[in-house]
Each structure stands twice: as structure tokens, then as C-alpha cells.
Amino acid sequence: TVTLLLDIAYIDYAGERQAVRKFFKKISNLPANILTIVAYSMSKGFTMYGQRTGAMIGVSSSKEVIDEFKGINQYTSRATWSNINRPAMKTLATVYKDPELLAAVQKERNDYYEMIKARADLFMKEANECGLKCLPYIAGFFLSIPDTDPEAVCSKLHDDNIFAVPLKAGIRIALCAVPLKKIGGMAAKIKAAQDAVHK
């Protein structure tokens, strides 16, 4: 059996609601030897960070595979985590029972998506203008900038009060945490820090 894990933690911030979910059709009739596991994070989609609530959904064309998936998880998940937290379960049930509340939640998610997209659009435009090389940005809370010495570049950025996250092979910028007014000029400062470190 081949297991495919789809991490959809940030799907609510990845684009137009229906468009970003179209790929689910591709996993509905796969061969019986493929089990797709969809990992969903309620803490992201419902902006409930710290609540540690989500779902692991198994999808297979084989009833036998799904029965095994269900049986295994019924015991191992319960033994590992006991039960998920009650306030998050209650929130989910309350929101989905009330069409007006659900519409308000979906509007709020879309507003956050548009806010982050505006930040990304500005950053990528300025990165292009100043020659800062970035990985392509499609959607999400973060963008990445390749670098061979991310620790040194991030340390240099502290001089400009920019606190990025050094990764193994680059720098992560948290678009979700930086207001639009502070995005302007950031790409040029990162490029200058890279140039200073790699001169």
C-alpha cells in the first residue's frame, strides 16, 4: 500500500474557497493500493492557535483499507491523545449548525487570505525590483528566500529590526505576522543584508 499524506492545514488561506478544494476529486477513485490521508488543522482554519485540534481523514477506494485505517486509529489515536479538547469541538459544531455564523467565519477567513496576499504581492513585487531571489509564492502564511548562510543574514537583519527565521537553506518571512506598512522596503533590506554577508 502506498500512503499519500495531504497536509491541508492552511487550505483556508490558499485561495478562493472552492478553487483550492478542486484537487480532492483527484483522490476519490485511486487504485485500492493507495491510501490518502488528509491532515486538517482546526487551529489554523478557525484561528484557534494552541487548541491543538484537527482531523486525520482516510480516503481509499477499498473498504478493507478504510476499515483497517479506522480500526487502527480508533485505538492508537485514543491511546496516544485520549480525546481532543471540548471547546474546539463545541466551536466546530456551533459554527456548522448556524449558516449565518458559518458565512461570517468564511468571510473572516477570506479577509485574512486577502490581507496576507496583499502583503505577499507587495513583497514579491519589491523583491523582483531589487533582485532578491525568492522561492515562488503561491499562497500561505510564509515565504522563503534561499540563502547559504541564513543565520548570518538573519542576524544582520536585526540591525533593521527585521526578525526572520533562519532555515537550513534559507530564510522564512512570516507574512502572517508583519503588517503591510512594514512589508514595504523589507525586500531591499534583506537583499542588502545578503549582499553584506556574502560580499
Identify the role of each PLM range:
Residues T3-L5, I37, F142, G170:
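Structural preference for beta-strand elements that scaffold enzyme active sites
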Residues S28-K107:
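Conserved core segment of the aminotransferase class I/II
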Residues A39, K133-I138, A164-L167:
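Short beta-strand
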